[in-house]
Amino acid sequence: MEGVNSSSSISDLDELARLLDRPRVNIERKRSFDERSFSEMGIFDNVNSPGGWETPVSSARNSFEPHPMVAEAWDALRRSLVYFRGQPVGTIAAYDHATEEVLNYDQVFVRDFVPSALAFLMNGEPDIVKNFLLKTIQIQGREKRIDRFKLGEGAMPASFKVIHDPIKETDSINADFGESAIGRVAPVDSGFWWIILLRAYTKSTGDTSLAETSECQKGMRLILSLCLSEGFDTFPTLLCADGCSMIDRRMGVYGYPIEIQALFFMALRSAMSMLKHDAEGKEFMERIVKRLHALSFHMRSYFWLDFQQLNDIYRYKTEEYSHTAVNKFNVIPDSIPEWVFDFMPLRGGYFIGNVSPARMDFRWFALGNCVAILASLATPEQSASIMDLIEERWEELVGEMPVKICHPAIESHEWRIVTGCDPKNTRWSYHNGGSWPVLLWLLTAACIKTGRPQIARRAIDLAEARLLKDGWPEYYDGKSGRFIGKQARKFQTWSIAGYLVAKMLLEDPSHLGMISLEEDKQTKPVIKRSYSWT
């Protein structure tokens, strides 16, 4: 793994210096960014990370000048607000009048609302976020059944819909815990996003009273009980079904997907900072600390892939027995796909999609890797390597519209087997290598934390060239993300909010504190690279 080159990234330092000279927005709410130390913010540990010279050059336009898209985006975001008894409680998934078939796009999705919530928090409007957090925790308390099976008490809804009765002049809420979803899979990520958003609200407002309420404390404990329960697993990672997260259709991510593991890690660390130090809280804290230590070691050791590790796997022996085995998961080297040898640069690395017995999914997944950086699941060196990979493989991972949800696409016979001939997930479309503008905020946050703001600026420039003109599509198709998705909804709320959050993060990097965690030295294991000798 490459070390940090202190002589590189001078352009990054100049860029950050310009950021710090700018005045704060809503300065009365918190100290200005330039009054806070880099170490306190915990986002500039890797300012001198390698590869700064190769960062794609942004356009000469100053992105901090008011862009016409910003006002349009705020108008569109506010049009998507959903009200319950006169109070805003979320935003609908899409506000597309041109589409007659609404499906469930008129509902408030937990994961979809996160970028909307962050936009409102960064704009000094926390009330809607508070309302959402309280409403969803009330929904969590309902009895949840799919057919004749009762779901776990801590399960959070995938979405909910506010039903207005004009005759009785009453509002009611219908929640979906997976019983109406395609494939009938419960959302594993909803509970994690809820905890992460609760911490973001607390960090942004300085108000700890919401997290300290009995409702929120109980809600966190119920979510944690589900994912910390003992079972037959020999790994600290969470075993999941296909379709349990943002990729909510069959895409071969069953097992231990990187997205869920990264969110799990971030939610555990977020909960640690908010649980009360009473008897119940301390019990969960002890369990969290043990799990974090095991999870960080497992992910950093077995999910991480760089050129050297790929070469090691290529040379693995198989059928090794006992605790001395180097090839612990008995991965057959012949199962390594051909594309990864060309894709892996000498400089760079990433967390692969999945690791389980005799199986490694070498695909790149953007959300999981960006969250790994924000949660400090990735070490500073690994975080820098992920950004190096994005720079080295810009055309493949960003292309003409940020950001590819995964790479590469699966096709032909593999597509038929893995997706079940899913007509929506054809190659380079939707979840199968499609480009999703919502991921722009996660990429931007990861860029700022690793001291690479130029990468984010270049990606935002690409988005600004088309997003508004195209009507804020849900996703784009094609190998480079050139075409509006064949079934993409227009005025997709999280595409709008993702853009706003990315812009506000670049304008005021101190916002990153609400969605970023510094590295916990206690969970940092000593990682020794294993070699398989022939």
UniProtKB/Swiss-Prot annotation:
Its EC number is 3.2.1.26. Invertase that cleaves sucrose into glucose and fructose. It is an enzyme of class 3 (hydrolase). One of its GO terms (molecular function) is endo-alpha-N-acetylgalactosaminidase activity. It comes from the Eukaryota. PANTHER family: ALKALINE_NEUTRAL INVERTASE D-RELATED, PTHR31916. Keywords: Carbohydrate metabolism, Glycosidase, Hydrolase, Phosphoprotein. This is Probable alkaline/neutral invertase D. The modification Phosphoserine is found at S7, S37, S532. It comes from Arabidopsis thaliana. One of its GO terms (biological process) is carbohydrate metabolic process. Signal peptide: none annotated. The modification Phosphothreonine is found at T55. It catalyses: Hydrolysis of terminal non-reducing beta-D-fructofuranoside residues in beta-D-fructofuranosides. It holds the Pfam family Glyco_hydro_100.
